[in-house]
Amino acid sequence: MPFKGKSRDDNSPMTETFSGASPLPHWGVIRARGADAAQFIHGQLSQDFVLLGPDQARLAAFCNAKGRMQASFIGIKPDAQTILLVCERSLLAQTLKRLRMFVLRAQCQLDDASEAFALWGLVGASVPAPCTSAWQVHSDGTAHTIGLPPGADHARALWLGPAGTAPPQVPQLPTATWQWLEVMSAV
């Protein structure tokens, strides 16, 4: 049941219902391309990207040799030779540098594709029906909508499209609202 009413902290974005889209400037995208992209990413992260279907997403972690998580990702495989990894932008450069160290002879190119994509968080009624289940991906050509676990009983999805394009026409929510719902989703 969602929290209704005021919190002790009046800066909290708590309200009865949320519906809309929030820009996600604090997130970025790592793109892995090539014949060995899925196999390479599968060997470096905590999830299986080899068997990942185009209609599925995975929550994955990049860990150090001691097993400590260095970065977490939401990953999709839009085609057989491409993996897109969405992560916190502040961790992207150092994680990309570390991943590149292990490419060696693999036919895989890694790059920071953040400028090539627009990232929006969809909440509530703005989440399309095919994405109300967590980790389901709905693609409509160039844009991908990824269902995420709900936060405070509000459906959530990540919209990933080409830079310069906008998500479905819905009210815009502050980024702080998305961040609060992200915490409330307990992922």
Predicted regions and their residues:
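Basic, glycine/lysine-rich polyanion-binding surfaces/domains
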Residues: 2-187
